[in-house]
Amino acid sequence: MRFGCFKLVFLLGFWLYAGLSYSSDKGYAVAGSFKSLTNAQSMALSIDSWLKSSGIPGQVEIEESAGKTTIWNRVLIIPGDGVSARSVISLLKQGGYAGAWFLPSSRVEPKQRLPVRPSFVQQKTEATDGLSSADLISQATDPEQTVEQVSTLFDMPVALGQGTKTLIDQQDGIPRHQIAVRNFLESEVKIKVDGKVDEDIWQRIEPHDNMLVAVPGTGAPAEYKSEYRLIATEKGLYVGAIMYQPPETLVRRMAGRDQSIDVDNFGITLDVSGEGLVGYWFMVNLGDSMMDGKVLPERNYKMDWDGPWLGKSFVRPDGWSGEMFLPWSMMNVPSAKGARNIGFAASRQVSHSAERYQWPGYSYSSARFVTALNQMKVEGVEPKQQVSVIPFASVTSDQALEDDDMKAGADVLWKPSPKIQVSATVNPDFGAVEVDDVILNLTAMETYFPEKRLFFLEGSEVFDVLPRSNMSYIMKTLTNDDWSRRSRRVYSRDFMPSPISLINTRRIGGTASQVALDEGVSPFRGQRDVPTDLYGAAKLTGQVGDVRYGVLSAFEDDVEWIGQIEDGSKVDVVGPGRDFATARVIYESIGENRKSLGYLGTLVQGPIYDAEVHSLDAHFVDAEGRLTVDAQFIYGGREREEGYGALIDMTYAKSATLSHVVEIDYMDEDIDFNDLGFLARNNYARLRYVMSFNKLDMGPSLSNYRSTLIAEQQYNLDDGLVTDSGLYWRSSIFLPRRQTLRMGVGYMPERFEDIDSRGNGSYQVDDRIWADLVLATDSGKVASYSIGMGVLQEHLDDWTVNAKAGVTYRPVDWMSVDFDLDYRQRNGWLVYQAGRNFGAYSGSEWQPKLDINWYISAAHQIKLSFQWLGVKANEEGFYSVSQSGGVLVAADRTLDNHDFTVSRLTTQLRYRWEIAPLTDLFIVYNRGNQLPTQFESSFDDLLTDSFSDPVIDSFIAKLRYRFGN
């Protein structure tokens, strides 16, 4: 009844307005103009349906309109008797067609009228399934349309090729849509996830294909047709995709879980909140390898989350296909009444053309992604209680320590509702089934290593305060990379800042930091790097209304080291472990602008001291996602040593090709949150500016030029000295034959070094130069290569030269070999000795790295990894920081021989059987070493000795099995 009254009032208002307007100039209403006839027909059909349902008399026509260089397909509404074109335009604008405009009848010449209803003949290269960026631009370039009449479509149902869609809005000329997903009972579906998409129920589902080229970000229609189908049940979402493509162009390769390689794949990103809070992304490679992770607004990707889902691929005569089953229970689905909106993006990697398709087809430089996803309207999806128990058992045989160990424990997860999720681990075994990279770091700055343990990764996004707590975000910001897999992926990490975060869970169960040693006792070689066992850990996360929260606690077992006394005898070193706790709460207001306020606190209790840190954070994103502001204010530290800190980040994305970032840091001399967080240094104030620019078309043979210009200045707060300053330019460009050239140049003005002396004064460093160049070849070939060179001016003005080369060899789908070799010839290399002293060295550094992967099947992998770092350095000068400070002066040597060597080895042979999601069997052999200085040894001797007398020599067998819904 209410709907009928509303419609009557609407029609009465329309006729009143029409009668008053009929005396206006006669003419036509134009809804839009398109290069593509199919898109014009789609709009015409939707408008015709709207006119009829609204009772408005009129006829929809499509006519050709010739511009200077282009033929446009113009959508006209010819008003019926007693109705003016201007009244129709007004109602069109109220209905969402804000770009409708008036065309006087005197300006309409006889032109060819075209059919409104499409013939539905679709070519794979035609833009039949969405408004491409070119079509949207065409609405602004109709020869008779003014700038004020430019608009896109809003909230009107449009049948764009296959699958009914509603156009919501656009970003940078790229549209996003809403679709309706059909819901079935799980018992009705009966889909076997085998990648074939051949069950009868799939044929009852409308396919969607609205793919545009997102990498490189041309926004052009996809060359090859894709058909995506979605089915929702009370248990999860089924995704079926058919990728049409000539069979001879398919690239099928196997890879490990979450390993990003150049291969054909398809994927989907889901924001189950529908509010742009966090996205879950899933990909299946042709070859059945799987990748998943989370993405925080806007493109803060994290690959360190693994969910229990299914995915398979299948080769067809006309291309390939794939299927996924994504359980709702593994995602934090909020409560909602009735139908819910879920954000989504579909994607497809076409390896042979080095393109990534996506719907919506935003480039990787767009201002918004997570907050501007497509929307799917889904009925019957309710949060499900999730219970899972993952018991595990492990056996370790340590040959180096002559010790055997057996361990059993369990991970437990219980999620009764979206408001709360409880997870716990009892007697966990974080055995070394993953290895860190071998790094040479002889400075006073700590090296950051990412978390790899599943328990600490699950649900960790609530504890992320600033985007730059994530290393992948830092890399993307400073390189402007779009993660193209066109060429072998090699990057320079020189002058990349470390993350800053109050929570670095690698501290939990990591190397012990509060061990009291008796006089005359020191840790035996390698003991300081031994991880600490945990009694257990627990985590509580959830959401209540607009408030998200998280609590984490963990308890270490006693520390057990092997020590040695002055005569070389070994003794046991035992001490209590540490306890850790964190608390996080954040309130989010999601409207036209997005605003949030949060609190994060951490506590570490140890046998020697306690450390407590508190912080407040605030965040703002404007309606278009172009302006983003993040701020965090910090107070705390160790007992009686509390300090203050602040971080402010501002990003302004002017367009898809140009953006600006400003970062402000302030950390006073007392702030220190490294007992649980990560901060490379304190006592500084820094300003960093980053301008990112990209240009797709650079000429007949060059494309996708991407660059950043970085300027930064840092001051020591105690003395007001400039302790870091630099101007850096980084860029990459696509060359012919799928090659990529990456370049970097930096100029570092005169500054003072105040950290490396470990509190013994500052010394002046003259201005310096850095340059790096890397060429990478086609990653789609059986063998792809990279070669590079670089130079760096050292603190004493001498030069270090770097040369590197690498190869990836894939002779068959199920095997890959990666080998990289890095060589540095150092001159004038300043290395800290003790007290106020430094040595200047010349020397050589070799760093080979080898990875061999053999995939017996997608579920069975054998991997051999080898990393070694060898250094031979000869002292050629001895210096000391002057007592008055500010300069290095020549000093007397404190030893007869200050030469040194470094030999660090990590080797692992690992078998993994992925029995089911989160159910694995690992059999691992680890061998590693860190040799003391051997003055007379050659590089061959250093490598041989690292193998022959290891400090790590262990076999590990570990089985975990997941039980749950």
Language model features with spans:
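Structural preference for beta-rich elements and adjacent junctions enriched in aromatics
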Residues: 142-586, 949
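Outer-membrane beta-barrel transmembrane domain signature of Gram-negative proteins
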Residues: 361-384, 557-624, 739-792, 798-802, ...
